[in-house]
């Protein structure tokens, strides 16, 4: 999907110097917004980003232009969008870990801000969290503790679980660290893992056909393709009577059982601060990569009832949100 949107932003006093420079050059500062999934899947995240930009004082037509593009979970499309942003000479690219590689491969000069990425140092996106270097900075998620915590939550809901299904898009290099961490955590907990590596939407049905006989619950790795098809995944999981756990809460809002992870709208709000700094003259390589400190547990009781699962009261008491 291609569209150009001028974002109506209130305020503007804080960015008058930049506005004056924009008028002198005849070109508004432009943000290339590279969404890894669909516009609807990212709607809460993009809205959070824009709302924070309003608070920072940016104003429509006078100070900023945002170009939205959506990869729909397809990495080849993400590469096309990144190349387009280079041709458009955008001032900053905003994206996330699932399609961050496409942006990195497209340019080494245009600043890139990732709202969320798993282990950006290990993946080679930045030199270090404190001193990223290069043209990239953003917000990092480390999955080591998160994967183990999610499996512990699954064990509370499915006592005695022995066989774990893992659904992951192996075509996404950013998913590999999470896959490794899930397998390591499963070994520690004594769980047998049935891994299904999807690459296309058509693989989802095949995965659940395999999981029916080889899993008691499903861990779904975070990925743009998975997010774009979250409703179908949850429908198949319910039909197979399989509890699911995710990272982003959006999966649970679409019918998944549980999620445990960072609040993605909060990450996109913080990413707006980083983009703001860069548009005011800061170099991305000098802006430390940040890490979230709060993680939310969300439980969908409607899904639990449909699965015939009684969620322990002790777990519900710890939940940040319960969907009924």
Give the positions of each predicted feature.
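Short hydrophobic alpha-helices and adjacent helix-cap/hinge residues
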Residues: 1-324
């Amino acid at each position: 999907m291609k569209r150009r949107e001028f974002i109506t932003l209130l305020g503007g006093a804080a960015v008058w110097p930049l506005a004056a420079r924009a008028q002198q050059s005849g070109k508004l500062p432009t943000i290339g917004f590279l969404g890894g999934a669909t516009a609807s899947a990212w709607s809460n995240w993009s809205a959070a980003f824009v709302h924070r930009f309003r608070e920072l004082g940016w104003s429509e037509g006078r100070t900023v232009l945002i170009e939205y593009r959506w990869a729909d979970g397809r990495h080849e499309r993400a590469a096309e969008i990144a190349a387009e942003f280079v041709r458009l000479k955008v001032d900053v690219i905003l994206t996330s870990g699932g399609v961050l590689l496409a942006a990195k491969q497209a340019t080494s000069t245009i600043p890139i801000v990732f709202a969320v990425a798993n282990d950006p140092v290990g993946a080679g996106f930045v030199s270090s969290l404190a001193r990223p270097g290069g043209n990239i900075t953003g917000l990092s998620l480390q999955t080591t503790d998160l994967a183990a915590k999610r499996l512990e939550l699954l064990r509370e809901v499915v006592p005695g679980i022995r066989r774990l299904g893992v659904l992951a898009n192996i075509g996404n290099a950013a998913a590999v660290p999470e896959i490794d961490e899930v397998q390591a955590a499963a070994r520690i907990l004594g769980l047998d893992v049935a891994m299904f590596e999807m690459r296309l939407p058509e693989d989802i049905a095949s995965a659940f056909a395999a999981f029916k006989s080889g899993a008691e619950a499903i861990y779904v790795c975070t990925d743009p393709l998975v997010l774009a098809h979250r409703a179908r995944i949850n429908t198949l999981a319910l039909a197979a009577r399989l509890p699911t756990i995710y990272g982003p809460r959006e999966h649970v809002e679409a019918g998944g059982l549980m999620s445990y992870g960072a609040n993605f709208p909060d990450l996109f709000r913080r990413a707006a601060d980083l983009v703001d700094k860069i548009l005011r003259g800061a170099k991305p390589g000098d802006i430390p990569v940040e890490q979230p400190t709060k993680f939310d547990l969300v439980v969908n009781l409607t899904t639990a009832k449909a699965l015939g699962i009684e969620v322990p009261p002790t777990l519900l008491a710890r939940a940040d949100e319960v969907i009924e």
